[in-house]
Amino acid sequence: MSEAELEQTPSAGHVQEQPIEEEHEPEQEPTDAYTIGGPPRTPVEDAAAELSASLDVSGSDQSAEQSLDLSGVQAEAAAESEPPAKRQHRDISPISEDSTPASSTSTSSTRSSSSSRYDDVSEAEEAPPEPEPEQPQQQQQEEKKEDGQDQVKSPGPVELEAQEPAQPQKQKEVVDQEIETEDEPSSDTVICVADINPYGSGSNIDDFVMDPDAPPNAIITEVVTIPAPLHLKGTQQLGLPLAAPPPPPPPPAAEQVPETPASPTDDGEEPPAVYLSPYIRSRYMQESTPGLPTRLAPRDPRQRNMPPPAVVLPIQTVLSANVEAISDDSSETSSSDDDEEEEEDEDDALTMEHDNTSRETVITTGDPLMQKIDISENPDKIYFIRREDGTVHRGQVLQSRTTENAAAPDEYYVHYVGLNRRLDGWVGRHRISDNADDLGGITVLPAPPLAPDQPSTSREMLAQQAAAAAAASSERQKRAANKDYYLSYCENSRYDYSDRKMTRYQKRRYDEINHVQKSHAELTATQAALEKEHESITKIKYIDKLQFGNYEIDTWYFSPFPEEYGKARTLYVCEYCLKYMRFRSSYAYHLHECDRRRPPGREIYRKGNISIYEVNGKEESLYCQLLCLMAKLFLDHKVLYFDMDPFLFYILCETDKEGSHIVGYFSKEKKSLENYNVACILVLPPHQRKGFGKLLIAFSYELSRKEGVIGSPEKPLSDLGRLSYRSYWAYTLLELMKTRCAPEQITIKELSEMSGITHDDIIYTLQSMKMIKYWKGQNVICVTSKTIQDHLQLPQFKQPKLTIDTDYLVWSPQTAAAVVRAPGNSG
């Protein structure tokens, strides 16, 4: 069946129309219908008629009106020849026609539907349009476009349609009488448009350019090709056979076929289909690269097809400034050339540096202050160093290392003079200078050295006291019997005994209480060698941060992790099993695989979310070793033993629905000859100043009371440990003396038995509060009720935030037989 016969076949959504021209003018040629009700024929129209006649002679199955309508050049010329008429409405419906068999590459059903949907083009020129409102028709067309939006391939060619003059009213009435149903498009109707002439002229979209002087009745419509299954119900109901689709065009030669990538994983462009037309082929190649999305809605004829704007990104400079793009015709360009050249001369060596320690971006220049420091030239040289808080301190450069930052490849390990070693760390070169004014911070000078009359070591103090006693022996007057002699509050002159020499016990207590660092001269040869080795090993810490649970903690001291782990900048430690890793990916994988959610051992205390676990070092040796390695990052003078058998570990945890999170711990020997109840105690920095330290101290003394011994922590204590213990001791003693301020006197022995604190610790604490005096060769406590109340009001002696409730403690002291296993027993 030819396409001319299909035009008379009703399709889905259309009603078969009767040839109206035959009823009114049966003898008139089809080409004359184009001029009904219109102006006289022009030479262009005569040429169109001749062209249609030639098409009919050549065997074309299309009418002259259709061929004329599909000629873009002739339609444009006809529109120019006609006088501009008043535009009543704009028809934006997509109209197209299958003109050549070579362009039909779809199935038979697709061709039939496209022909039946738009075969009314020629009939619309012959018959007047139906009196149907414009707005509903546009809404129906928009609904069809939305239904077929998911099946859009690419935009089709642009066609021109010239609106014809209105037909006589009589002919319009005849059409209304014959058509019983509205010509509404069916929901199954799909638009199918191919190229006008794929292999000839007009195949390029640039050939169809809208003349800006064209009358407004010329509409540019963009049509899309929608591949979808069609249902030609009207044709099937009539029983009309469908024509077989024409054979596809022959494939091009082998040399025209693009080469296939050698590898299926090749990232090269995919070759286009060989049966596509040149225009579709070019569009296919353009769409294979990222571009703008395909426009589905028809464009306005007055809209220009502009290329996408060029993406102009701001230029990121070393000063983090956004430089805007300026046009070539700007007058400011020539005036600022000289200024830019001067700035380039000044900033020749301007680079960016990202400080890994302070997480700040700084600008470095080529001045001498940014040059590399040679530590070997002057190891004891003192520099000015800016800390992270902005203060400038005097310090010493101890070590250097190379970083991944190309702009500032060197970092330096510095020690601040007069500050604790836990504040040492790695800093960038821009934070070190010979002049404090170059760093731009508040300069903090170290504490002044001790006065000549104040000893720096116990040996010097003993020498000064001996000289003072010899000089004042002849001038000393007899003291009154009732005069009270309080110990001095100053730690360096605590013992006010001008007529006595300091004993070895007093010297040891003085060094322990004040954490006096012994000089190498006071140590034996073996001890001095070990101390020097310890300082050389622990002087430099390479692990800057510790990722532990939800916290990233800055480390304080050196810890002897293995070589590859000890030099890592960030160490990742699982908070449940204490396994350490170097890489974040390994840490994330381990957290997913680790099934432990609490420390090993048994839980001996639980109140609220506070839990304490007792872990035997002999049973869980690996876990205890890992715990000690991690604790060494925050403890200076801590001795690590690979033999964990003699120790018990008490781990304090906060428990929630995810598990038990380690807060701190303390360890103790199973059997101590000196009755030490704490060998090592630590609260992690994120949990400090929350009362957990005093809670662990109180728990250790509670265990000592249950064992029936009076315990004390191992000495020396760190600076933070000494403050915590002194605060706990002071509050405990004040609470005991608060109810005993009667005429009878309380003794140090009674306080020791009630509190579990040793005599030496009680004397040290009362001396710091000026509540003890030395009278007739013994220490006597002399306090009043007002003195106790005044001390309890001080912030350092306030009540602890957390206390131990013995009702929740499930623990009994272990006997010697349980601690030390009898020989010969296995297991």
From Swiss-Prot:
Question: What are the residue boundaries of the MYST-type HAT domain, all occurrences included?
Answer: 538-813
Composition skew (Acidic residues), residue ranges: 19-30, 121-133, 176-186, 326-350
Pfam families cross-referenced by the UniProt entry? MOZ_SAS (PF01853), Tudor-knot (PF11717), zf-MYST (PF17772)
Q: What EC number(s) does this enzyme carry? A: 2.3.1.48
User: What GO cellular component term, any one, is given?
Assistant: X chromosome
Q: Tell me what happens on changing residue 384 to Y.
A: In strain: Africa-0, Africa-3, Africa-4, Congo 194 and Mof.591A.s
Q: Where is this cross-link: Glycyl lysine isopeptide (Lys-Gly) (interchain with G-Cter in ubiquitin)?
A: 372, 483, 532, 539, 715, 749, 776, 798, 801
* Start and end residues of each stretch annotated as Disordered: 1-190, 237-276, 288-309, 324-360
Describe, by residue range, where the zinc fingers (C2HC MYST-type) fall in the chain.
571-596
Catalysed reaction(s) here are: L-lysyl-[histone] + acetyl-CoA = N(6)-acetyl-L-lysyl-[histone] + CoA + H(+)
UniProt keyword Protease present: no
Which spans does this entry mark as compositional bias, Low complexity? 103-116
What's the top EC group for this one?
transferase
The residues that hold acetyl-CoA are 681, 689-691, 693-694, 718, 727, 774, 798
- Give the result of residue 48 to S, as annotated: In strain: Africa-1 and Africa-5
Q: Which GO terms describe its molecular function?
A: chromatin binding; histone acetyltransferase activity; histone H4K16 acetyltransferase activity; lncRNA binding; zinc ion binding
Q: Describe the disruption phenotype.
A: RNAi-mediated knockdown in male salivary glands, decreases chromosome X gene expression. Simultaneous RNAi-mediated knockdown of mof with RNAi-mediated knockdown of Mgtor in male salivary glands rescues the decrease in chromosome X gene expression.
PTMs per UniProt: Autoacetylation at Lys-638 is required for binding histone H4 with high affinity and for proper function. Ubiquitinated by msl-2.
Query: Which protein, by its recorded name, is this?
Result: Histone acetyltransferase MOF
Q: Which organism encodes this protein? A: Drosophila melanogaster
Gene name linked to the record: mof
